[in-house]
Regions:
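Residue-level signal for the nucleotide or nucleotide-sugar donor/cofactor binding architecture
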Residues: 44, 74, 112, 146
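Nucleotide-activated donor-binding/catalytic signature segment of Leloir-type glycosyltransferases, i.e.
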Residues: 7-18, 23-50
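A short, well-ordered alpha-helix in the C-terminal region of glycosyltransferases
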Residues: 116-119, 123, 130-144, 154
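Nucleotide-sugar-dependent
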Residues: 45-52, 59-80, 86-98
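Alpha-helix C-terminal capping/helix-to-coil transition sites in glycosyltransferase folds
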Residues: 54-55, 102
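Short alpha-helical
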Residues: 21-24, 47-48, 67, 94-95, ...
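Short acidic-capped amphipathic helix/loop micro-motif used as an active-site/signal-coupling element
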Residues: 1-4
Length: 159
């Protein structure tokens, strides 16, 4: 639904890569709605993925609203590593929204909040300075909380 809202903005294009749970649904939506602002690619090797990631303006993810557990998609580490601001939606109660939003590394909303997701996307699309700042904050978050060094310190401190 987000892509439909940006069909008239030629500077916005969605690229979906890999084999997620909803690939068939995505392809059906693209076909049924004749969406020209979405490209889907099957899984690519890691080298190609990182080359592509370097070209993206925003890293996006979506977790199904039916998830009952906490989930931290590995792609977020890639987004943070490449200083990409994060745009996402998560199931209600998922603390991932707090992690990203409190670090100002991006904007994560509830999966059922279509208007909130649109507004978040618009903020990131319309402001390169906000994208750059949030991307930097994401990189800082990665280094402070998710690097091997920081995790090693956490493990040692809990011994």
């Amino acid at each position: 639904n987000l892509a439909k809202k940006f069909t008239k903005n030629s500077s916005v294009h969605f690229l979906f890569v890999g084999q997620g749970d909803e690939v068939e649904l995505l392809l059906k939506e693209v076909s049924n709605n004749k969406l020209k602002n979405i490209t889907y690619l099957p899984a690519v090797n890691q080298k190609t993925y990182f080359e592509m990631l370097n070209e993206f303006d925003i890293g996006m993810f979506s977790l199904h609203s039916g998830h009952k557990t906490h989930n931290f998609p590995g792609k977020l580490l890639g987004y943070m590593s490449y200083s990409k601001p994060i745009l996402g939606c998560v199931n209600s109660g998922n603390d991932l929204a707090d992690v990203v939003n409190s670090a100002k590394a991006g904007i994560v909303v509830n999966s059922n909040d279509e208007l909130g997701l649109y507004k978040a996307a618009k903020i990131l699309i319309d402001s390169k300075s906000i994208r750059n700042k949030m991307g930097k904050n994401g990189r800082d978050l990665l280094l402070s909380q998710f690097s091997v060094k920081s995790i090693s310190k956490q493990i040692v401190s809990n011994l």
